[in-house]
Regions:
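Short hydrophobic/glycine-rich mini-motifs in sensory/regulatory modules
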Residues: 42, 185-205, 290-294, 410-412, ...
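Structured interaction and signal-relay segments at domain junctions
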Residues: 96-109, 115-171, 368-369, 390
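Catalytic core of PPM/PP2C metal-dependent serine/threonine phosphatase domains
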Residues: 126-128, 245, 249-258, 305-391, ...
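A short, aliphatic-rich beta-strand micro-motif
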Residues: 173-175, 180-189
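Regulatory loop-to-helix N-cap segments in sensory/regulatory domains
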Residues: 195-217, 422-423, 467-468
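Amphipathic alpha-helical "output/dimerization" segments
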Residues: 207-228, 312-316
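Regulatory cytosolic signal-relay segments
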Residues: 219-279
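Active-site-proximal, acidic helix/loop segment immediately C-terminal to a metal-coordinating Asp/Glu
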Residues: 304-324, 407, 411-468, 484-487
Length: 488
């Protein structure tokens, strides 16, 4: 650029600044105070002289002064003073970061129904076409979360489709539909399985590219988190996942449950309950920290809304005491007092409270009239945990003994309610302890992770009863000492 051109630009900026100052409705003192607060180092007299064209400023000092005026103009007038240097871009417009930013910005104050639209725009920033499929609460079908007025898409079976394979195994699976290559990417919130993403590249990008798959993983992680968050303030996602209305008792319990699966380092826990829409008194809970995993499972007497209230009270008493830093003794006592104090007529809940030291494998537990937990080691059910027996919660404290067991790396702990082993077929035959043991050992040989094992177990219990349960059936599976594989 020539000297004359440079001088002309300087004069233009100076004239614009002087004009803007007149419109800013500021005194020299007010302008200088703003300029000085932004880091300007010229004195009041120098600023006055510069505005009247009697002296010159460096480009940096001009821009600081211009910014002080622009801040005022933002309050009073739409025109702005031009800067010496072009302003930086306000955000990414292409690439993986642009896709993530579009998701975050797009879902800010957006209802759940807009999530497929926002996800599609995020995919476009990566040159991809993305469709969200959410798993239903039966974990049997994957249903599309469609954009408004988009073409109809068929639901896909968890046990009978490539998409279902990606969901079951928690791994990205490539496939080709017609001539169109695609990726099925597990949709996770943390390690909880929510569904899959259908990823297609309209531009013919190589879907085997590790960098592209990594970007899909980032999108999946954020979309999964947004699905969960949006469920707290809207029903759009649940409308897809719910295949029929829950009973009030079931809805109460579901709103109190933690995520169905969670993991920290080398510990994974996964729970599931059935029937999804009519569960009455079953519930489970857990809390994970770097050093400790706390587990709990409850079965309140009866199958009515009152049973749901008892289970909810037990869960709340357990959580509030645990969060206050108290141990198993205090947790059990709080549950006794809460149930006995709030419900008449002999209300109670059976249950197991357990606390695992994640450094040593030391397990401490209390069993309040509940089926005994099972310990699996090297793919075999090696023992029942028979200690720590006491009365059900709500029937009096009595004597309380905390039992101990030491786990070894890769051990599994299996907690369940009586609806699992007491499930009956049409001939009245129980599912039983032996069938449960055989099922767990077969699953261990298949190397399925805890959430898939829980899903298959509940499915087996339903099949044993011709899909009609006589009682709630809940399982809580925990594995310690093996790095979890529930990542993409």
């Amino acid at each position: 650029m020539s000297f004359d051109q440079d001088s002309a630009r300087y004069d233009e900026r100076h004239r614009a600044l002087a004009l803007a100052f007149r419109r800013a409705d500021l005194t020299f003192e007010q302008l200088w105070n703003r300029y000085f607060a932004l880091g300007g180092n010229a004195g009041l007299i120098e600023v006055d002289a510069y505005l009247h064209g009697l002296t010159e400023f460096s480009a940096l000092q001009h821009d600081i002064l211009a910014h002080a005026i622009n801040e005022r103009l933002d309050e009073t007038w739409p025109q702005r003073v031009p800067y010496s240097f072009p302003p930086r871009a306000t955000g990414p417009h292409t690439g993986p970061l642009a896709g993530l930013v579009k998701l975050l910005d797009g879902m800010h104050q957006a209802p759940p129904e807009l999530l497929p639209v926002v996800a599609a725009r995020a995919g476009q920033a990566l040159g991809l076409r993305i469709t969200i499929y959410l798993v239903d609460y039966e974990q049997s079908m994957l249903h599309p979360l469609r954009e408004p007025e988009s073409p109809h898409l068929a639901s896909l079976g968890v046990d009978s489709s490539v998409a279902g394979r990606a969901f079951r195994a928690v791994e990205t699976v490539p496939s080709t539909t017609g001539q169109q290559p695609r990726l099925w990417v597990p949709l996770l919130d943390g390690v909880e399985r929510l569904g899959v993403l259908d990823v297609v590249s309209p531009n013919g990008a190589d879907l085997g590219d590790p960098e592209l798959r990594l970007r899909c993983r980032w999108l999946s992680t954020l979309i999964g988190h947004l699905v969960t968050i949006s469920t707290h303030y809207g029903d759009g996602a649940d409308a897809v996942r719910l295949q029929r209305a829950r009973t009030p008792a079931a809805d109460l319990i579901w709103q109190l449950l933690p995520p169905l699966t969670a993991a920290t380092g080398d510990f994974t826990v996964s729970g599931l309950l059935e029937p999804r829409y009519e569960v009455g008194g079953d519930a489970f809970d857990y809390a994970l920290s770097p050093s400790t995993a706390t587990l709990a499972i409850f079965d309140a007497v009866g199958h009515t809304l009152r049973s749901g209230f008892v289970a909810a009270a037990a869960l709340a008493a357990h959580r509030s005491t645990r969060r206050a830093g108290h141990g198993l003794f205090e947790q059990a006592r709080a549950m006794d007092e809460t149930i006995a104090g709030q419900f008449s007529g002999g209300a109670f809940a059976t249950g197991v409270l357990a606390e695992l030291d994640l450094y040593s494998g030391r397990l401490r537990y209390v069993n309040a009239g509940h089926p005994e937990p099972l310990l699996m080691r090297s793919g075999k059910v090696v023992k029942r945990l028979t200690g720590g027996r006491r009365l059900p919660f709500g029937l009096g404290t009595g004597e309380l003994t905390v039992a101990e067991e030491f786990l070894q790396p890769d051990d599994w702990l299996v907690l369940h309610t009586d609806g699992v082993t007491e499930a009956r077929d049409h001939n009245g035959e129980f599912f039983g302890d032996e069938r449960l043991r055989n099922f767990l050992e077969r699953e261990a040989a298949s190397a399925h992770p805890p959430p898939e094992t829980a899903r298959r177990l509940v499915k087996a219990i339903l099949a044993h009863q011709n899909d009609v349960l006589q009682d709630d059936a809940t399982v809580l599976l925990a594995r310690w000492g093996k790095r979890n594989e529930l990542t993409l």
